[in-house]
Amino acid sequence: MAPSLKKIVLWSFLALPSPVNISIWWNIGSLLGLLLAMQIMTGIFLSLHYTPMMVSTFSSMVHIMRDVPGGWLVRASHANGASMFFMLMYAHIGRGVYYQSYILQPRTWLVGGNDFLLSMATAFLGYVLPWGQMSYWGATVITNLLSAVPYLGDSLVTWVWGCFSVNQATLNRFYSFHFLLPFVILVFVLVHLLLLHDKGSSNPLGNMSHVSKVSFHPYFTWKILWVFVLLCFLLYVLLCYITLMYLRTPKTFIEANPMVTPTHIQPEWYFLFAYAILRAIPSKIGGVVALAMSVLYLYTFPLALYSSAAATAYNFIGQLLFWGYVSLFFLLTWLGACPVEEPYISLALPLTVMFFVVPGLYMISSSYIIRSFQFLLSLK
């Protein structure tokens, strides 16, 4: 290993100066990296036995679960690991919003947004691969949303499908991209890490103080390893042994039948908030735009660069707005799993409007509090 590369690795993982007062919320990024590595490894093992053929895909999944030694554990680890990955990713994003990392490190925030989008795309592609009833119809419904694009919509849908319906060509494309995208995510994660360590990590005070810092190793490496051990215990003992497929939709275990449409089509739980927003808008193109903005709005947070950073812990209004926003996320997730009927339809629209309004109010409130403090200090 070249000396320069060795120095970069040691600086990034061992000798990095880290604030002494960071809490467990700052460990989530490292846990996400470990989970990403685990997902890549389990995915490679699954790909050794998976058959991307419409006539035998579902049978190959049954073969993995029944005949391959430890195959059931590998598949359960991969499926439940994806759920845990998104749990931690949402917590990681929430920590960044709460402590306003988008102001302190805007470039790192934007690259992290790319990681989030690529992770969502990878998870959606993987959801289709078992070729169950919900997988097939989920792919049909979600990809058909591209038809809302003016002029190019129908051509885009045909291009994604590879034909005039979801078929063998679609499965081949989804399998190829699901295998490749995690490595693209890995590249963006490394860029995210380099940008983060370029300026140093923030702290619960909401600043970039360089006064009190310690070496990342051994003070924080052991802490991360202990949390990762607890995470593995939760994943394998509770999710893989006790509740093997509790987070999966039951219709996923029924082989795909293009002639029978499920009464209720829904994605995985970590996409339900966006799915509820999609269904809340009566217009198809309006729903697609709202669906896209429910994720892309994260890129607007660095627009608050005109203000200084201040932790939400010192902003009571910001705390109310932040936890209100978290409540909206959970409510929309619940509504996304509910059938399309009253009163769920009437509840979804106002919650969707609030979902887009509250983040803007949060950023405005933070800027207002900061300017108020600056004004009071100027009076002294």
UniProtKB/Swiss-Prot annotation:
Q: What does this protein do?
A: Component of the ubiquinol-cytochrome c reductase complex (complex III or cytochrome b-c1 complex) that is part of the mitochondrial respiratory chain. The b-c1 complex mediates electron transfer from ubiquinol to cytochrome c. Contributes to the generation of a proton gradient across the mitochondrial membrane that is then used for ATP synthesis.
Cofactors needed by this protein, per the record, are: heme b
Q: Which PROSITE patterns match?
A: CYTB_CTER, CYTB_NTER
What does the cofactor field's note say? Binds 2 heme b groups non-covalently.
Instruction: Fill in the subunit field for this protein.
Output: The main subunits of complex b-c1 are: cytochrome b, cytochrome c1 and the Rieske protein.
Q: Which GO BP terms, alphabetically?
A: mitochondrial electron transport, ubiquinol to cytochrome c
Where in or outside the cell it occurs: the entry states: Mitochondrion inner membrane
Q: What does the similarity note say?
A: Belongs to the cytochrome b family.
Q: What is this protein called?
A: Cytochrome b
- Indicate the transmembrane segments per the record: 28-48, 72-93, 109-129, 174-194, 222-243, 285-305, 317-337, 344-364
Q: Which SUPFAM superfamilies does its entry note?
A: a domain/subunit of cytochrome bc1 complex (Ubiquinol-cytochrome c reductase) (SSF81648), Transmembrane di-heme cytochromes (SSF81342)
Q: Which organism is it from?
A: Cepaea nemoralis
The record, for InterPro entries, names: Cyt_b/b6_C, Cyt_b/b6_C_sf, Cyt_b/b6_N, Cytb/b6-like_sf, Cytochrome_b_N_euk/bac, Di-haem_cyt_TM
Positions bound to heme b b562? H78, H178
Alphabetized, the UniProt keywords read: Electron transport, Heme, Iron, Membrane, Metal-binding, Mitochondrion, Mitochondrion inner membrane, Respiratory chain, Transmembrane, Transmembrane helix, Transport, Ubiquinone
> What extra comment accompanies this record?
Heme 1 (or BL or b562) is low-potential and absorbs at about 562 nm, and heme 2 (or BH or b566) is high-potential and absorbs at about 566 nm.
Q: Which residues bind a ubiquinone?
A: H197
Question: What is the gene called?
Answer: MT-CYB
> Gene3D superfamilies of this UniProt entry?
Cytochrome Bc1 Complex, Chain C
Q: How does it sit in the membrane?
A: Multi-pass membrane protein
Top-level taxonomic group:
Eukaryota
